[in-house]
Amino acid sequence: MISGGKLTGLRDISSVSIRIPRQSTNCGGEVLKKLCAAKDNVLIISPPGGGKTTFLRECIRAISSSGVRVAVCDERGELAAVFRGVPQFDIGPMSVVMTDIPKSEAALMLLRSMNPQVIAMDEISSPEDCRAAASAVGCGVRVIATAHAAAVSDLKRRNVYRFLLAQDVFNNIVVIENNAGVRSYRLETLQ
């Protein structure tokens, strides 16, 4: 149901999906090692359900464990699963989390107040999210984010991501593919 342009409720529900996130350490293999060693901005892509959030969480943990300050924009609580102020997932010792706040606002607040070296954002999908990522990069902060796409060509077809590509916000793209139930991770460099 929509009231005043906002979703206010649901009715005639035919199904419910309950997503149960889990920690998966060391996923991504060599690609994860390259991302931890590099200082580049990275966009992680795959279709829905492809493992983007799980891989991003592992990137956060690995980078933070190396002594780098990571600010996590966890709008829906999927990255850190914060409960009473404590992350329920291991996101590393140098991570701070802002949860239940729109990513675009959280990124700018974290940028101003937490002195991050890296900002992590899951499922950037709006012009505001893209502008926040570009602002962070413009301030010298590394950004690692996820987006729904099967390939770079998909990003180029969508207006919201064309801005990021035109502004050279991301240097690298990690493409996650699922072949017969086995995930593979490929790192592509943007020119």
Question: Which residues make up each language-model segment?
Answer:
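Conserved P-loop NTPase nucleotide-binding/switch module
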Residues: 114-174, 178
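Hydrophobic positions on the alpha1 helix immediately C-terminal to the Walker A/P-loop
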Residues: 55, 59
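P-loop NTPase switch/communication element
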Residues: 36, 63-110
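Conserved lysine of the Walker
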Residues: 52
